[in-house]
Amino acid sequence: VNFIFNNLSHEEKVDFSCNNYPKKKNPGTAFVYHTSDTYLIGTSLNNLLSDKKENDFFDDLLVPIFNHHNFSDKIKYIRRTNDIRNQPYTGWGMFLQRDDLIKLNSLLQSSERIKYFSKEFLDEGLQRTEDKGLVAIKQSDIFYNNGFWAARFDKNIFGCKEDLMIPFMSGFGGITVVFLPNSMMYYYFSDNFTFSWYSAVYAAHNIKPLC
């Protein structure tokens, strides 16, 4: 099966990303997810930085944040194309330790996050605004907004005043990182295509109420 993972050079990846999924809907009207689209985002970011001192979004913008907050050395590496462009894969190819997830959750929960990231963009992704994003999986009440997935939980389950929108990140094969509204986090890394995590939400609520 031809997929963006099979293409090693920057030119091949851009060609695949642009030509294998023709546009069918107007932007912002229907949820469509392609991992290859994230590669185009990374390419666009580096193109925007090409005339600046910081010309690599990963090494020059993200790694300094990781350094400042004492993330592991593993997270400071990302897979890249095997050509002179040396383009970061962007949507995949990173490596994390468990402690990196804890530090990421702490950063996203703190006010310091707005020093590095757009407050509006991140608040939307973390379900802190009225903009809940687009429905991604209707039958499961799953949404997608600014790089984050979110699951809707009925307010009556936890005795809340409003339904809960719980943001999470999801990766191929069985990777889940859930950012709970009580500041707790749940993560599960596997390669057996297990994506069930709702029981962890109920357990977290018993430890510390979600609302």
Regions found by a protein language model. Name each.
Residues 35, 55-59, 95-102, 115-119:
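Alpha-helix initiation and capping sites
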